[in-house]
Amino acid sequence: MKTIGYAIVGTGYFGAELGRIMKEEEGARIVAVLDPENGETVAKELGCDVETDLDTLYSREDVDAVIVATPNYLHKEPVVKAAEHGVNVFCEKPIALSYEDCDEMVKSCQEHGVTFMAG
């Protein structure tokens, strides 16, 4: 089975908890997190790297997918940038706070041929 490398953007309660769950899943590996407030702490717990820039994070060869768990109003940038880098996306719900942002995020993922899931 191929191991999928996951990044997590936003390591508050939901992001950190999803990381803990994914760490135990066969075929999944948390490779890096990005969060200016508690990224270092969560990275240490998960045994992964810390990144401070979305472009650097998404340019990593070992990042196949990203979990976006930032505050709801901050979902758009990490989703659109992930799509631009060809990284598949799982985004916490709600996807965004406006129809326009949702539309832009979905269209960006479609345009770049990446999988976009919300939950």
Model region roles, listed by residue range:
Residues M1-E45:
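N-terminal Rossmann-like dinucleotide-binding module
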Residues G10, I67-T70, G119:
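Small/polar loops that bind or transfer phosphate-bearing groups
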